């Protein structure tokens, strides 16, 4: 509902002061990329540019090439189909498509899922670089504690079908809810916090 893909069951979602008509202002990266298998990477990125902005295919392909470069993919990746890509390349291609319309807000669903620790750390750094360079608001869903500690300014914890807390990571981690304590202070949580403290 937040990204505008589903209607809310109750109430309304307001983004940038509007409840509708913000599709051009947001980019979405789906957990598994959701690239069209019959289109090349370049065509996947150019598609929303052509459809939503009415730009010519030639110009859209030029813009797509820039987005490909921004995400660290080699230029020749634009001519590949999703089936030809590694998991990390799919994430970057999907991120390039999410950036296609120069959004103000990026919605990312499990952006580091399926990546090895080195690839996930590289992706986190890429997200932070893009966020800072383009003044993006990044809204992400993740279970990756390293990503939380590396890339998040504020955290909302959802458990038992409700929001338990929304605050900075330090405040969230200190919350006295049993589930939160287990999540943030278990072995993986402690390792992620230690790693973040060393960085």
Predicted segments — roles?
Residues 3:
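Helix-to-loop junction immediately C-terminal to a conserved catalytic motif
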């Amino acid at each position: 509902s937040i990204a505008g893909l589903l209607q809310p069951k109750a109430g309304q979602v307001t983004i940038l002061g509007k409840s509708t008509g913000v599709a051009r202002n947001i980019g979405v990266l789906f957990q598994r990329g959701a690239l069209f298998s019959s289109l090349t990477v370049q065509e996947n990125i150019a598609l929303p540019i052509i459809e939503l902005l009415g730009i010519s295919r030639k110009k859209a392909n030029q813009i797509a090439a820039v987005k490909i470069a921004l995400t660290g993919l080699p230029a020749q990746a634009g001519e590949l189909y999703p089936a030809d890509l590694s998991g990390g390349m799919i994430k970057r291609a999907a991120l390039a498509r999410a950036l296609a319309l120069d959004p103000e807000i990026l919605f990312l669903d499990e952006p580091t899922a399926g990546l090895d620790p080195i690839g996930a750390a590289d992706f986190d750094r890429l997200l932070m670089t893009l966020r800072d360079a383009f003044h993006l608001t990044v809204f992400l869903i993740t279970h990756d504690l390293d990503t939380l500690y590396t890339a998040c300014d504020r955290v909302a914890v959802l458990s038992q079908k409700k929001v338990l807390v929304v605050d900075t990571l330090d405040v969230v981690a200190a919350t006295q809810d049993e589930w939160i304590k287990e999540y943030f202070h278990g072995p993986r949580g402690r390792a992620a916090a230690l790693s973040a403290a060393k960085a």
